[in-house]
Swiss-Prot record:
Residues 26-80 form a propeptide. This is Urocortin. Pfam families: CRF. The keyword Hydrolase does not apply. One of its GO terms (molecular function) is corticotropin-releasing hormone receptor 1 binding. Belongs to the sauvagine/corticotropin-releasing factor/urotensin I family. The gene is Ucn.
Length: 122
């Protein structure tokens, strides 16, 4: 739980560093838009190292958690329709781990087959 709080704090600090008061992201009109309008600024998980990981993270967070014009108390928050980010990350990590496990098992099978063919060929 403590690491999760640190990660959240780090992300918040990165967002604050990227946003400037003269930027349009601080205006109520931009907050009311509620989406990132420029398609070039959309986060694409297939494209890596295009402008750095921090920029991609900030763009993803800007899409998922747009700024609201008024601050609402915690009990009156609007319910989000899209799934939480942690589920997306969990499934991404699961797919990656399954792919790594599949690759490793293929290597082990290839090594076992090589040993068998070497012993039969002698």
């Amino acid at each position: 739980m403590r690491q999760r709080g640190r990660a959240t704090l780090l992300v918040a600090l990165l967002l604050l560093v990227q946003l400037r008061p003269e930027s349009s992201q601080w205006s109520p009109a931009a907050a009311a838009a509620n989406v990132v309008q420029d398609p070039n600024l959309r986060w694409n998980p297939g494209v890596r190292n295009q402008g750095g990981g921090v920029r991609a993270l900030l763009l993803l967070l800007a899409e998922r958690f747009p700024r609201r014009a008024g601050s609402e108390p915690a009990g009156e928050r609007q319910r989000r329709d899209d799934p939480p980010l942690s589920i997306d990350l969990t499934f991404h990590l699961l797919r990656t781990l399954l792919e790594l496990a599949r690759t490793q098992s293929q290597r082990e099978r290839a090594e076992q087959n090589r040993i068998i063919f070497d012993s039969v060929g002698k």
